[in-house]
């Protein structure tokens, strides 16, 4: 089975999200409609205080996690905002499956997996006829929880490194654009 789902893994800070964003920009510049969710850091005074998730089709944002007290699951010093993740992130994935040509999911990680509707949305995207470009947290890519995703015949896994992170976006954009053009 040919790959139509492209997953990027690698150590934290190596450039997985940057690869996905650059690939999405290249696809958009070719006239491809890209949807889904991307995650970015929120910084205050030079310190990371949280993460926001953004819907690529609508531009809507919500907090994925913030430093501090509060109700909700914790990952390290962060409190995961499951409701905002579901409203913005899960909504973005499902919207992209129905409205876009390519689905972006950044990232499949420990924070996102606290949402009971996140993994089903990811699986719906992977099972769709749309190409998926996703990042997967390094620890999750080596754990049993997501082994079923990684062992799919339609998944191609890339490990992002300092050596390949600038080469991957044009390569991925070409591969994905060729799938959309069929």
From Swiss-Prot:
Transmembrane segments: none
Record EC number: 3.6.1.15
InterPro entries in alphabetical order: AAA+_ATPase, Nuc-triphosphatase_THEP1, P-loop_NTPase
One MF term in the entry's GO annotations: ATP hydrolysis activity
Chain coiled-coil ranges: none
SMART domains from the UniProt entry: AAA (SM00382)
Domain of life, source organism: Archaea
Family under the similarity heading: Belongs to the THEP1 NTPase family.
Name the record gives this protein: Nucleoside-triphosphatase THEP1
Source organism per UniProt: Thermofilum pendens (strain DSM 2475 / Hrk 5)
């Amino acid at each position: 089975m040919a790959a139509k789902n492209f997953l990027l893994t690698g150590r934290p800070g190596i450039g997985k999200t940057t690869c996905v964003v650059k690939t999405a920009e290249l696809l958009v510049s070719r006239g491809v409609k890209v949807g889904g969710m991307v995650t970015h850091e929120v910084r205050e005074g030079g310190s990371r205080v949280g993460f926001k998730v953004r819907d690529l089709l609508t531009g809507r944002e919500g907090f994925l996690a913030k430093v501090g007290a509060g109700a909700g699951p914790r990952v390290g010093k962060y409190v995961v905002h499951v409701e905002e993740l579901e409203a913005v992130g899960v909504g973005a994935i499902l919207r992209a499956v129905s409205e876009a040509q390519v689905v972006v999911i950044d990232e499949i990680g420990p924070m996102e997996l606290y949402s009971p509707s996140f993994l089903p949305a990811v699986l719906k995207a992977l099972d769709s006829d749309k190409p998926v470009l996703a990042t997967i947290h390094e620890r999750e890519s080596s754990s049993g929880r997501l082994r079923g995703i990684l062992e799919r015949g339609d998944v191609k896994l890339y490990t992002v490194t300092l050596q390949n992170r600038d080469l991957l976006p044009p390569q991925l954009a070409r591969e994905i654009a060729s799938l959309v053009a069929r």
